[in-house]
Amino acid sequence: MSTFAPQLAVKATYMRGGTSKGTFFNLEDLPTSCQVAGSSRDNFLLRVVGSPDPYGKQIDGLGNGSSSTSKVVILSKSEVPNHDVNYLFGQVAIDKAMIDWSGNCGNLTAAVGSFAIANGLVDAANIPDNGICKVRIWQQNIGKTIVAHVPITNRQVQETGDFELDGVTFAEIGRAHVWTPVTQWYL
């Protein structure tokens, strides 16, 4: 009789930023072996997204067979002075076992501030009751500072509105929380 390892549940958030979608993780929620760069982290993230997939569909993961949706983001509280959050971006290849950690995704950068606030990575004292919260992001891949301006209503990220973006059907920021591998979804 074969024995199998138990399924691993890891908190993740599937978000849209601009015209891209990706799976977001708080670094602390990843398995310990995946909290540092290396094959354990990459193999785990490849599995979450569903790569490599010789059919190019990523049916067995959260990717969607498109470079616009085959992306991962890892965020953590920043220890870089004058920054709230560290942002690490990975572009996941669809048909091969590779993650490119060398660049940034401007589209998903638009979702980093919202995720950081909603997941307690921004000091609560810096979040206004209403208005705009400036989230100071250290983009680890390229070593640059990015400042996100996130609308806040009643101390929560404002995820609805009427802004329209070419190539995106709906105005609001889409966010779904998942426990990966895909075992539970909640909105």
Range-by-range predicted roles:
Residues M1-R175:
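A glycine-rich beta-to-alpha transition motif near the start of alpha/beta enzyme domains, typified by
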Residues W179-L187:
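Positively charged, low-complexity/disordered segments
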